[in-house]
Amino acid sequence: MTIKAEDLPYRPCAGIMVLNAQGLVWAGRRIKEGNSEYDGSPQLWQMPQGGIDDGERPLTAAIRELYEETGMKTVTLLAEASDWIHYDLPPELIGIGLRGKYRGQAQRWFAFRFEGDESEIQIDPPPTGHSAEFDAWDWKPMESLPELIVPFKRAVYEKVVAEFQHLSGK
């Protein structure tokens, strides 16, 4: 049986851009997973993101996901994107990526300033007992982010960078 993208919903998701005092953005390198949307891609750097639970507000999900994936708690909200940003999985990943249940994601993005000490950042393992999603992290120039993400998410990152560019201090 062939799964059609138009028969699947978008997964509601919160995306999180975290800037340090120098205006650089936190990015983590995804752990390679076989048979997933990251399988075989050399562009594995991304900002934290995660699903919004039923009944959960997007900002609450963003704060929860940020802590679950990175351990960061000492952050200040700077901005919220003006609208939801959608992406579709490429046809070859329909029925595989996002556990096969979604055609892509509808993301609500938030920008935060990291105010803590870098010792707060824990990715492997993260502090909540969840499985690690990243095997490395770094502070990246905001304008470099679209080139670091898997190609099918590049347009999302271009929109996020455009939305929050004024926060980088450049």
From Swiss-Prot:
Molecular function GO labels: bis(5'-adenosyl)-pentaphosphatase activity; guanosine-3',5'-bis(diphosphate) 3'-diphosphatase activity
Position of sequence motif Nudix box: 50-71
Enzyme Commission numbers on file: 3.6.1.-
Alphabetized PROSITE patterns for the sequence: NUDIX (PS51462), NUDIX_BOX (PS00893)
Keywords, sorted A to Z: Hydrolase
Hydrolase keyword on record: yes
Record InterPro entries: Nudix_hydrolase, NUDIX_hydrolase-like_dom_sf, NUDIX_hydrolase_CS, NUDIX_hydrolase_dom, RppH
GO biological process: nucleoside phosphate metabolic process; ribose phosphate metabolic process
Recorded family membership: Belongs to the Nudix hydrolase family. RppH subfamily.
Superkingdom of source: Bacteria
Pfam families the UniProt entry points to: NUDIX (PF00293)
Domain Nudix hydrolase: 9-162
Name used for this protein in its record: RNA pyrophosphohydrolase
Entries under SUPFAM superfamilies matching the protein: Nudix
Cofactor section: a divalent metal cation
PANTHER family: NUDIX HYDROLASE 26, CHLOROPLASTIC, UDP/ADP-SUGAR PYROPHOSPHATASE
Enzyme class: hydrolase
Physiological role: Accelerates the degradation of transcripts by removing pyrophosphate from the 5'-end of triphosphorylated RNA, leading to a more labile monophosphorylated state that can stimulate subsequent ribonuclease cleavage.
